[in-house]
């Protein structure tokens, strides 16, 4: 996977290759505010264009097939799927009350308890119902019914056809089990990341008992079958590999850390997807839940189509959580139920607080960008096999934060000055050249040298030669191969 960045640190291209075959290939364009304007598929040429409101909230996308997808926010952050914002009704705190397909009913704590195609089941202005008030509505075929633990975690979901999905958690709110259709799905965590999961038949699940000291004892061994191990990018929530049955699947994620492709060990694509403006999957190839991770921190349950988001569950079909933010307004989300304003830049890893997660590279100051043609500097990380040259004087100006380099040796000083537009009035004496080989991962800004005109107008140099800018000061001494006196042959 290779990425290039502009001078502001925004990723402008991302490519992956497998066994010398082109894989994921995207080009990105950003506006002056750092918001994603469009994405071009480098293989098909398809373009997706995004639009934002005055405060930077993502409000629509026009996909490569010409279809529009709306996520229109109102003044308080509630989102609508129609351009005229007439397809939904909202209540206090941003809870959705009604859309084109369902009515939504809540308990007194603000947790969603019924999603039903039946209309007009309550007259309460915020659709609150409860057994205590005698307003509880029973599940019927076609409904989704939700039950909650006392700590606000989702306990179970009864599906429209009658089957029930149940959930269990540890004391830290990490989900440890899901029970559905006679099977137990188990999860093992390392801190805040899920590292393993497996499943087996519910009849084989060991029973638990409490001894005289209050300790929980497991009666027998728990089966470990169909084990899946997840590998993550170091220090992050971004999955990079799936290990299952002796096979390793490589996961490719986009600049936000969202999985977009998975390859088997033969280099074949086994899973592929894009995302819509609500974070739901589009253009899926392969089995949907083969890779269950979505926005950072989210894990999709195929049975409910909800995203488990640690302390809450997100519904990508409506763009809302189904319960209030446990930390209320401190979460900094648009509403108590709302997800982040801009899904192309922000995420909510724990279902508590939104934060900017867009992966960026280093930026280049405006003063240096002016020395590149049209101010265009593309940032990338070197491979570790590349050679660069720094031409300089006796002072050996390698200690500066930013150093200009080239990728070739010059036979004449005139050619060097013309390509790099080095004016005589600057007093730059070319006496030495330092050859160095930066380690893999070192950032370099690249472009072509900008045209330069002397103050009196008598010297004009067009530039246009390759020009790089790099922080040599931070490079280990081992990267410097040699410094020698320049010997031009022409």
Q: What do these predicted ranges mean?
A:
Residues 354-490:
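Catalytic toxin/effector domains delivered as secreted proteins or via bacterial secretion systems
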Residues 25-36, 42, 47-56, 112-118, ...:
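Surface-exposed extracellular loop regions of Gram-negative outer-membrane beta-barrel proteins
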Residues 1-7, 13-20, 38-44, 60-66, ...:
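Beta-turn initiation residues at beta-strand->coil junctions
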Residues 26, 74-75, 85-92, 245-310, ...:
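A motif-centric feature for acidic-aromatic and gly/ser/thr-rich catalytic loops and repeats
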Residues 262, 280-282, 312-322, 326-327, ...:
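Short, low-complexity export/processing leader segments characterized by acidic and small residues
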Residues 19-25, 118-143, 203-222:
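Intrinsically disordered, low-complexity Ser/Thr- and acidic-rich flexible linkers and loops
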Residues 3, 28, 50, 71, ...:
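A residue-level detector for well-ordered beta-strand positions
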């Amino acid at each position: 996977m290779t990425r290039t960045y502009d001078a502001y640190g925004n990723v402008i291209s991302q490519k992956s290759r497998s066994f010398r075959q082109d894989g994921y290939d995207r080009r990105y364009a950003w506006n002056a505010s750092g918001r994603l304007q469009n994405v071009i598929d480098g293989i098909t040429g398809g373009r997706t264009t995004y639009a934002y409101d005055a405060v930077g909230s993502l409000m629509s996308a026009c996909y490569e097939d010409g279809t529009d997808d709306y996520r229109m926010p109102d003044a308080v952050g509630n989102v609508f799927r129609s351009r005229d914002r007439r397809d939904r009704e909202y209540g206090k705190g941003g809870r959705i009350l009604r859309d084109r397909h369902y009515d939504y009913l809540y308990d007194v704590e603000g947790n969603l308890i019924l999603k039903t195609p039946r209309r007009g089941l309550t007259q309460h202005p915020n659709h609150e119902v409860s057994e205590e008030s005698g307003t509880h509505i029973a599940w019927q075929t076609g409904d989704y019914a939700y039950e909650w633990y006392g700590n606000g975690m989702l306990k179970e979901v009864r599906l429209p056809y009658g089957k029930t999905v149940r959930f269990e958690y540890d004391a830290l709110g990490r989900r440890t089990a899901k029970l559905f259709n006679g099977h137990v799905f188990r999860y093992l965590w390392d801190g805040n990341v899920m590292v393993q999961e497996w499943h087996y038949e519910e009849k084989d699940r060991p029973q638990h008992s409490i001894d005289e000291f209050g300790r929980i004892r497991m009666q027998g061994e728990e089966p470990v079958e169909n084990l899946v191990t997840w590998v993550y990018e170091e220090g992050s929530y971004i999955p990079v590999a799936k290990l299952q049955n002796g096979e390793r699947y490589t996961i490719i994620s986009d600049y936000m850390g969202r999985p977009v492709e998975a390859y088997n060990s033969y280099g074949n694509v086994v899973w592929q997807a894009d995302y819509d403006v609500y974070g739901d999957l589009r253009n899926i190839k392969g089995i949907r839940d083969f890779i269950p991770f979505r926005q950072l921190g989210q894990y999709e349950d195929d049975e409910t189509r909800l995203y488990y988001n640690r302390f809450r569950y997100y519904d990508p079909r409506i763009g809302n959580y189904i319960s209030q933010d446990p930390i209320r307004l401190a979460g900094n989300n648009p509403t108590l139920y709302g997800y982040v304003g801009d899904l192309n830049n922000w995420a909510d890893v724990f279902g508590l607080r939104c934060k900017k997660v867009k992966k960026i590279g280093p930026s280049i100051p405006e003063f240096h960008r002016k020395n590149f043609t049209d101010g265009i500097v593309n940032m990338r990380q070197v491979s570790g096999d590349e050679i660069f040259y720094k031409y300089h004087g006796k002072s050996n100006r390698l200690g500066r934060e930013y150093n200009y380099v080239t990728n070739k040796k010059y036979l004449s000083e005139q050619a060097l000055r013309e390509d790099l537009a080095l004016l005589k009035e600057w007093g730059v004496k070319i006496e030495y050249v330092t050859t160095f080989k930066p380690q893999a991962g070192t950032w370099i800004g690249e472009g072509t040298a900008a045209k330069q005109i002397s103050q009196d107008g008598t010297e004009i140099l067009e530039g246009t030669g390759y020009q790089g800018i790099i922080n040599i000061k931070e490079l280990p001494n081992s990267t410097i191969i040699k410094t020698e006196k320049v010997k031009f042959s022409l």
